[in-house]
Amino acid sequence: MIGRLRGIVAYKAPPWLVVDVNGVGYELEAPMSTFYDLPELGREVTLYTHYSQKEDSVSLYGFLREGERRLFRDVQKVSGIGAKIALAVLSGVTVEEFARMVQAGDITALTRIPGIGKKTAERMVLELRDRAAQFGAGGALPTGSGPAPADPLSDATVALQQLGYKPAEAARMARDAFNEGDEVATVIRKALQSALR
């Protein structure tokens, strides 16, 4: 199993990134919480990883903080929840915000996260409430900001679609959040914050 990677950021376009470790490029899927704090291309990064192997695919997920990886794993223990929804949780709210929602039984706030309906939110509260206090952000690693992609509006729209939003809704959210000069991570962060209000 691969538990951690340290290498050079070779590529990043939400939700995908490639980390070059001694000449081997590891492709990882990561939540927006990780993308917000990734160093720029060509800089070193250390990521906590989660390796997943299924019949037809092998996936590697990356997180800047141990607490995010722990939450990613715990959320998937809830029946009916997979990696896509776990990534949406970490892309929409912080570990601490999610813990507060679960502890308070705030079904309404949980259903604002893409892919989570009322029944799923209720299951999350029921199955995670006892562990919610243990969700911790963990230590943050050195961060930086990357260069703006060629088309942050388009990239943000694609990233929002991959988080579970319908194409028209993702395009509207990205347009509403976009300001000239914004990086893709900024557009996505503002769009998700707006959607969760």
Curated annotation (Swiss-Prot):
Chain spans, region Domain III: 153-197
Gene Ontology MF, one: four-way junction DNA binding
Principal cellular location given in the protein's record: cytoplasm
Chain residue ranges for the region called Domain II: 65-143
Any single Pfam family the record assigns to this protein: RuvA_N
Segments of this protein annotated with the region Domain I: 1-64
UniProt KW keywords: Cytoplasm, DNA damage, DNA recombination, DNA repair, DNA-binding
Location of the region described as Flexible linker in the Swiss-Prot/TrEMBL record: 144-153
InterPro entries membership: DNA_helicase_Holl-junc_RuvA_I, Hlx-hairpin-Hlx_DNA-bd_motif, NA-bd_OB-fold, RuvA, RuvA_2-like, RuvA_C, RuvA_C_sf
UniProt subcellular location: Cytoplasm
Subunit structure: Homotetramer. Forms an RuvA(8)-RuvB(12)-Holliday junction (HJ) complex. HJ DNA is sandwiched between 2 RuvA tetramers; dsDNA enters through RuvA and exits via RuvB. An RuvB hexamer assembles on each DNA strand where it exits the tetramer. Each RuvB hexamer is contacted by two RuvA subunits (via domain III) on 2 adjacent RuvB subunits; this complex drives branch migration. In the full resolvosome a probable DNA-RuvA(4)-RuvB(12)-RuvC(2) complex forms which resolves the HJ.
Biological role stated in the UniProt entry: The RuvA-RuvB-RuvC complex processes Holliday junction (HJ) DNA during genetic recombination and DNA repair, while the RuvA-RuvB complex plays an important role in the rescue of blocked DNA replication forks via replication fork reversal (RFR). RuvA specifically binds to HJ cruciform DNA, conferring on it an open structure. The RuvB hexamer acts as an ATP-dependent pump, pulling dsDNA into and through the RuvAB complex. HJ branch migration allows RuvC to scan DNA until it finds its consensus sequence, where it cleaves and resolves the cruciform DNA.
Family note: Belongs to the RuvA family.
Protein name: Holliday junction branch migration complex subunit RuvA
Source organism: Stenotrophomonas maltophilia (strain K279a)
Gene label: ruvA
